[in-house]
Amino acid sequence: MKKFLLAGLLLLPCLSEAQPRPSLSGDYVEVRTASVFAGACHFNGEVVTTGRDAMMAWNVQSGRWRGISLAGVRAIAVVSSEANLADKALRRSELIIDSGASEAQTGAMVDALKENYGALGKVVSVRRAPVKFEHTGKSYLVSAGEIATLSVEGMPNDECCKMPHQVWYEPLVPLMHRKVGYTKGVQYSGGSVAEGWQRADENSAFYGKFLI
């Protein structure tokens, strides 16, 4: 009996190591420059002509990275490629970290995003700006001064769940409870990765909870 108890105790550390707990968690929303939920004809009309840019936003609600608390830190990434982002072509991205974060938090947030999200491609610049991230019900409103803004609403009656065959893409990052959103508006003023762009009134967003 003692041998079995000893063997069980020795297994506990192994089980703990095999199931690491996420370090960071919070809200996430992204907007693409192509509809992610649409009919087949609409999708085929866009897939080779657009969808080369995206805006991604994180609101960390809890967690630490490299020993630094990132709770309350907000960040935006603007990603650009020469082909539709679904094609896995080379990408460049610009990060915008909330100016309310400390230097240590900024460095840790940049490190966490670069290490966990290959979807960013090559991060060519990091900017600081007052980033706001509002999530109320199924509504998301994110802004970074005059650099970037997005406004997303959940789809009525969760239509994307009822017609999954019309969801043509996956989010750029893994999400829990992923939903498709309606983009009321998104705008990027331009920077190191792309010229300015804007879109509105299309089903081009994903939102949910992120865990890393």
What are the language-model segments listed below?
Residues 1-4:
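Positively charged n-region of N-terminal signal peptides that target proteins for export
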Residues 12, 28, 35, 154-155:
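Processing junctions and N-termini across compartments
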Residues 13, 33, 40, 159-160:
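The N-terminal extracellular segments of secreted preproproteins, especially immediately downstream
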Residues 98-210:
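Mature, soluble, non-transmembrane domains
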